[in-house]
Amino acid sequence: MEQQPSVPRSCTNVARETPMNLNIQSTTGTRYELSVPLNETVDGLKRRISQRLKVPKERLTLLHRETRLSSGKLQDLGISDGSRLTLLPSVEAGLMSQMSRPEQSVMQALESLTETQVNDFLSGRSPLTLALRVGDHMMFVQLQLAAQQSGGSHLQHRHVITRGADAGAPPQYRTLHTSTSALSHLASCTPGSTPPTTLSPTSSTHCDAPHSSPLTTSVFRSHGEGVSPCAEQVPCSTRGTEGTSSSPSSRSRKPGAIIESFVNHAPGVFSGTFSGTLHPHCQDGAGRPRRDIGTILQILNDLLSATRHYQGMPPSLTTLRCHTQCASQARNAKATSPQSTGPQQTTHPVGHCQAQTRTCKPSGDRLRQTENRATRCKVERLQLLMHQKRLRRKARRDSRAPYHWMPTRKSSRTSSNSSTSSGEGSLEIDFEDSLWKPDVKAELNSEFVVA
């Protein structure tokens, strides 16, 4: 008698572990089966369907026996093995599509990823491509991480997401952006193991990383309000490099990312480098990134936070030359000047180099002025072309008119008609003079006077 209750308990445990099959039927005619656990919720079922159909779960509506499924467990709603669910399409009309915020697009793109895609991406086995929508504009972001390797060998075109206090040098990323606004930095973290064909080598320098914001969508909201129109759909690819040894400065770096260089290759296509360290709450006890979409979201969030700290344009050859000259002059001044002399002899070349660097460093205001000047020239040229087009249209219309009543053309007509008969000339002059009476008197030849 005492052994009988143990048998149904084991049976119930086995029954709980066995999944149940659901028949999903859409109103458009699509039918397929989906295997879910017995304790699955409505939200989890919508997430599975959205991952399979590549549709945001907010646009999915499920019906079971004419009842809309909104929340709760499937078993509590009377859904069992072999149940049939109806999938309704979501139709948007009017300006509803423009009301979606950028952070919703990011979250929808991340939530549509399967667990296999997230694991393969974070482990570096395969790249990940996200399609982001901001209003009526699309932007494709390709992310790729390098597989973490043990040992201190030099890794080229790879990077490792590490903890800021326990790992080595922070990773450097090279990015290729697709938009022309602050949101363009979102399409950035795509380091890969193979160099892309559309990317030219750029320089990278180490700087202190800014403080990263928490894992929320507030940064997406703040940057999404002032975005400008994005460019056309251009796929992105990146690569990165990592140093060999760690330094005390790199160990003490705060979690986050910082953009080090930025190059505009073409309208809507950008490349650059940035370095950063993953936040500790996105890592496990061994320092590896967590297999979750929150890790990907943190990387994007750190990049958006880095855009606010990045000011200025990419360093040109002149700027790099100025920095090199200043460093060499300062080193020579410190080596050659005796310690007994005052600081006046050493501060002059350094101050001169600083002024030279200040003049060589391009600023954002200068770029904006150049863009405004180019836009103004384009507008003036368009106005000139439109004015010429109006003049040609007016001349064409005047040539087709049966009579020419413009007073400014009277003298030209009288001079051209001087070879005609005197009767016709006198009639035309008397007729026009009686109507218009221009201020400038026409020159009359002798034949008109005789008539």
Curated annotation (Swiss-Prot):
Residues 187-254, 331-372, 388-427 are annotated as: Disordered. Residues 190-205, 237-250, 336-347, 413-426 have a biased composition (Low complexity). Coiled coil: none annotated. InterPro entries: Midnolin, Ubiquitin-like_dom, Ubiquitin-like_domsf. The keyword Nucleus applies. Pfam families: ubiquitin. The keyword Nucleus applies. PROSITE patterns: UBIQUITIN_2. Residues 388-397 have a biased composition (Basic residues). It is found in: Nucleus; Cytoplasm, Cytosol; Nucleus, Nucleolus. Residues 363-372 have a biased composition (Basic and acidic residues). Residues 20-94 form the Ubiquitin-like domain. It comes from the Eukaryota. Keywords: Cytoplasm, Nucleus. Facilitates ubiquitin-independent proteasomal degradation of polycomb protein CBX4. Plays a role in inhibiting the activity of glucokinase GCK and both glucose-induced and basal insulin secretion. This is Midnolin-B.
